[in-house]
């Protein structure tokens, strides 16, 4: 039975089969690249006046069962160490389903690359983008208004049901409240186990809540967007992706109303932000490396990653290889020299264009569960199902609350690498000092 059964208002048609098989989070079968960016979004009437609408704001939140009783909220532990709904036991992968592990924390946690003692709070004056761009941004001190939008979708009853996404949201809400002072009354939570229509994670509700999140944002405010669910890729129609593909997330009703692409999320949650406003986005989904479409992606050494310069080599690379194999060394060298010059100029031009399109004067940070070409795992930690990325972020921050951005990225990877192939990514809307203390 597809999620929302009994709530016919949300379904609108026969139950869809759920996101693609194998936890690869790609588009549903036969739907590759068929969802164009919504025309004229947001839909008429967005954002509603006085949003959140009546009954939507989490009055008196959290409801019973969300209380911060340790990592595993009471009543949400699986029994007997088993998972149902096609999930596997003991970390074995079966039938193409995603991997599930019961892991111990990595013994070398905290030994990652980076400054273990962050340099302190962010500077209070505007910062330049460099390279004579004339652009500036401002770090947020995160002392203003705090708001959070948390989305967790288990797709309950579908053939690609997930187990840890709703738990991720519960754990994240408690973490934000306990460690960074976010009020439950300033959190909007969308999960597919709720009865209120406005809290079901449909495409409409997710977009509406994104707009609520950034509405009336001011300098030094701190906003959080956390998504745990299926993710995928679709063909890039704008030309701002190095890979030629856009990252997407799958709402509960994606079969009816389509997915949400990274360009839309960027336009809704990044572009409206004023200088000095902080948005922290956390994506626990597959193919989520650049899910918020931010131009600066950082390595575990704290430097901006360079684009793949060989991806545009095309026939030039083939000609160079052919010349080499036939003994024409000078021809090979000539071809390769032309390739390097062409690609370097193209990469520089494309990168400058992307920065102009996607950079922001605000302070936007995105931490994602994996690279754009990787999948992200469901885990079993602390006696409950959880997303591996959400677990590693919360565990790392609980154990080392005073650490830098670089240390956080490396420690998350350290926790995951013993059992998972995924590599968390950190991207920014501006050049980031990775040795500053992580705040949100």
Curated annotation (Swiss-Prot):
Feature: compositional bias, Gly residues: 82-94
Entry EC number(s): 3.4.22.-
Compositionally biased residues, Pro residues: 14-51
Stretches with biased composition (Polar residues): 98-110
A Pfam family this chain is assigned to: Peptidase_C14
PANTHER family, alphabetized: METACASPASE-1, METACASPASE-4
Protein name stated in the entry: Metacaspase-1
